[in-house]
């Protein structure tokens, strides 16, 4: 596999900051927002958005962590480690993930959210949208659109877990 860095740490920071400004612009009542990071890297991105919202607007937006494994149609896991600090009923929930690909993880996250309560609205923020949807799901806030072939992979590294911020494109030797 060939590896190519397609987003560096500075570009990642800018993309998350831009997504935060878009969230501010599109939401009239920021006090009603709840961020829901999809484990694992989605939680880290959601925390960064939460920090930016605090810096820019002075708001403490609640942040939950969604475990989608028990809601997936391709993996059977009994334990659900979802943590949601507030009741999401009648709140505007913003799901946050690192990569949007087929849409299956997001479908599982929506199932999890509906299991927790009845939000007023659910929207989606992703750092990378790579295309290839299998379900009718689209992101409302996108850091980077990176079209890929189905044989390529996107890997998001985050300093919290990987000691570095970047996005890599992995491809078979003959594709890059």
Curated annotation (Swiss-Prot):
Keyword terms, alphabetized: Glycosyltransferase, RNA-binding, Transcription, Transcription regulation, Transcription termination, Transferase
Catalytic activity: UMP + diphosphate = 5-phospho-alpha-D-ribose 1-diphosphate + uracil
Single GO MF annotation: RNA binding
Coiled coil: none
EC number(s) on file: 2.4.2.9
InterPro entries: PRibTrfase_dom (IPR000836), PRTase-like (IPR029057), PyrR (IPR023050), PyrR_bifunctional (IPR050137)
UniProt-listed CDD domains: PRTases_typeI
BP GO terms, sorted: DNA-templated transcription termination
Signal peptide residues on this chain, from the entry's feature table: none
UniProt-listed Pfam families: Pribosyltran
SUPFAM superfamilies reported for this sequence: PRTase-like
Motif, PRPP-binding: chain positions: 93-105
Subunit text: Homodimer and homohexamer; in equilibrium.
PANTHER family listed in its UniProt record: BIFUNCTIONAL PROTEIN PYRR
Family: Belongs to the purine/pyrimidine phosphoribosyltransferase family. PyrR subfamily.
HAMAP family: PyrR
Job description of the protein: Regulates transcriptional attenuation of the pyrimidine nucleotide (pyr) operon by binding in a uridine-dependent manner to specific sites on pyr mRNA. This disrupts an antiterminator hairpin in the RNA and favors formation of a downstream transcription terminator, leading to a reduced expression of downstream genes. Also displays a weak uracil phosphoribosyltransferase activity which is not physiologically significant.
Protein name: Bifunctional protein PyrR
Species this chain originates from: Streptococcus mutans serotype c (strain ATCC 700610 / UA159)
Classification lineage: Bacteria, Bacillati, Bacillota, Bacilli, Lactobacillales
Name of encoding gene: pyrR
């Amino acid at each position: 596999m060939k590896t190519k860095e397609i987003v560096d740490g500075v570009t990642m920071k800018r993309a998350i900051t831009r997504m935060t400004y878009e969230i501010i612009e599109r939401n009239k009542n920021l006090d009603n927002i709840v961020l829901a990071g999809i484990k694992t890297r989605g939680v880290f991105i959601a925390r960064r958005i939460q920090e930016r919202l605090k810096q820019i607007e002075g708001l403490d937006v609640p942040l939950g962590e969604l475990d989608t494994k028990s809601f997936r149609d391709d993996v059977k896991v009994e334990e659900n480690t979802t943590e949601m600090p507030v009741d999401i009923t009648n709140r505007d929930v913003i799901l946050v993930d690192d990569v949007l690909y087929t849409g299956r993880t997001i479908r599982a996250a929506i199932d999890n959210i509906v299991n927790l309560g009845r939000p007023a609205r659910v929207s989606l923020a992703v750092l990378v949208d790579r295309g290839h949807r299998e379900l009718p799901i689209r992101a409302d806030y996108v850091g980077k659109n990176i079209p890929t072939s189905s044989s390529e992979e996107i890997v998001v590294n985050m300093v919290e877990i990987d000691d570095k911020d970047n996005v890599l494109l992995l491809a078979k030797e003959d594709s890059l």
